[in-house]
């Protein structure tokens, strides 16, 4: 399978910082992988941070919340996020994600 990764390990010491990601507030810390078809990211949005609103023009996105709370605005509708939540943004739709809690 060459360079294709099958397992991603979360290591908070091995994350890159992306300031104002997609036009969002503060920054996110993340590790990203893209194979030309699928994009995978594992990371952290700090309290008061966000991922700016964007459209998924060529792919879909699934967000699984490991810890903390926040919300997404998906096609204009607010959806609350908490530990264990899964948010899906299909191709052609837009969303933003915000951490408005202390964690």
Describe every region a protein language model picked out.
Residues 77-91:
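Short acidic-glycine-tyrosine-enriched beta hairpin
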Residues 1-39, 52:
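A short, N-terminal "cap"/entry segment at the start of jelly-roll beta-barrel domains
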